[in-house]
Amino acid sequence: MIKEGLFPDNMSLRLAILSRGPRLYSTKRLLQEAREREIDVSIINPMTLSLFSAGDSLDVTSEGDSFEWDAVIPRIGHSITKHGCSVLRHLDQLGVWCANSAEGIQQSRDKLQASQILSQNKIPIPKTVYVRDPRDVERAIEYCGGLPVVVKVTQGTQGDGVFLRYSFQETKNLVQGLLLSKKAVLIQEYISESHGTDIRALVVGDRVVASMRRRARGREFRSNYHLNGTVEKFEIPSEYEEVACRAALHIAGVDLLEGEDGPLVLEVNSSPGLEGIEKASGVNVAGEIIDYVINEATFSEVSMDQILRTIPGEGVLSIQVRQHPKLIGNPIQSLFEGLEKLPTYALSRNNEFIWNADGETLLRFDDLVICYGDLKKLRTQLKLAIFKPVSETIEEQKQD
């Protein structure tokens, strides 16, 4: 049943599961759990949706009828990522709640972009090199800690396009072949401690609801369930749970390797299969997902970046303190001394986001300062603060 107070008596949540596979285990389980909670639910093939755009209106139709669902759970297959994400963007603009965003799905499915975002947020990953020229293979192998190495294409799923190579020549030949076939190639550190095994953490919202260990069979090093790997229940340590939640989307399967120094994120799956993890863990994962949708579908996340860009002359600027060493040790308010009033700003530090931090807070090497206001005035003032002569800065610090 729908939890009391979430929806008025005369209003029922209308839920669409976007999937081309109505007979797949995961799709059927989500449908079953939604119906048990008396939700008006349907499975919609995203390929049947048409998108209408005009200067003042948007619309979506499903097999000729208007799309009239309040929320969607996207189960977008890898081969239709582009179309599926276009659908999600359209629905989002129409106010339809989406369990995962188009941006999140696209980023998670591009292994290069995913590694960049994870690294930017200081989430541990295996050392990774994006290679465009076979002449860089030797240097990439050295960067990754030597042989063997894992070679991957940036677009792949369920272990497809992932290879383990033990020699330089084998690696170079493989990379050359992939590049000739117009594939984007990654060379990645091989984590020997996790050979043939990984941990799948199923994240829903801000918590891990289930986890399992996957093991490859025989000489296979890829542990994917779809490659006939075995699964077993796994009690996830708090350190691994924290990393998984930081890496995940709203609903995601996060694959973790057990490195010598702790967990490493291997991949984030925006449309995780439920069969293996439900069987291994004994957890009703589909039910957890449906309950999450019921609780969250009343609220829609807003992209502030898009909204702020609609105000003429105003926008957001950011400063990486590490790029401007003279700022280190100065109070954050010194960035805005020439402005009539302090702008709205935030400080990103140690994975925390602090809105309007105390102006006396001293800037550190790894800080990121984000500010919003009149772009022309902000740029002028920030340039003055960044490029202020060192002699003036020292004199001011002496006076303080």
Question: Residues of each region from the PLM?
Answer:
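Conserved N-proximal alpha/beta basic substrate-recognition cap immediately N-terminal to
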Residues: 20-127
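Long, charged amphipathic helices and adjacent flexible linkers at domain junctions
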Residues: 301-320, 391-397
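ATP-dependent carboxylate activation and anion-phosphoryl transfer catalytic cores
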Residues: 13, 238-305
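Phosphate-binding site of ATP-dependent enzymes
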Residues: 160-243, 247
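ATP-grasp fold ATP-binding core
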Residues: 118-119, 141-160, 183-194
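Cytosolic Rossmann-like ligand/nucleotide-binding regulatory domains
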Residues: 323-385
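Short, compositionally biased
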Residues: 91-93, 360-361, 378-400
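Rossmann-like NAD(P)H-binding beta-loop-alpha module
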Residues: 124-146
